[in-house]
């Protein structure tokens, strides 16, 4: 599987940070291809203008239709006319791990990173297939959300992570938060590693990890538990967690 992503952005240099770590490894392995189109390169006036004042008044500027439309046209000429366009915006649907798993199979994708007060709505109506948000807060532009999405999708590519089970055991992959992690030394001050992790009993370790995952999810994200239909074993482990924590 190869992930092909195009990005429409005024600041392609921001994405240089992706050349490190997991994403950098995927790029070197040719498991991931990133391409960029800057709307400013498609502005037709001498000042290469990409924004203008909003109709109806108000603060800030709005990204213009024409440069974005031409940038998207160039991107689709390279990636394919039917390539889906994803607009990163606080008004979008909340991005979840389930969506990431689904959309990795929709490659190639074009990510549209807006700036200023937003994008002319006519561009969104004409060109955008879906709108996604990474949370209920405001950033200066769509570049960071685009990088979040690229990172989340790249992690799911087979062979990109150091261990084959790393992605499958991440938080949210099974609809739960991650279990607790420990490494050497065995004891720090008065805080030892839980003895079960030193036992070598893989079944007991798996049981403990699931119990901690269920308990942590209940403590921090009860909405995830309520959306999940717990098995008898999971309910029993969650009850044990409550008893041990009381």
From Swiss-Prot:
Binding site for S-adenosyl-L-methionine: 114, 134-139
EC number: 2.1.1.228
Localization (cell): Cytoplasm
SUPFAM superfamilies linked to this entry: alpha/beta knot
Protein's GO biological process: tRNA N1-guanine methylation
Subunit note: Homodimer.
Protein name per Swiss-Prot or TrEMBL: tRNA (guanine-N(1)-)-methyltransferase
Species assigned in the record: Coxiella burnetii (strain RSA 331 / Henzerling II)
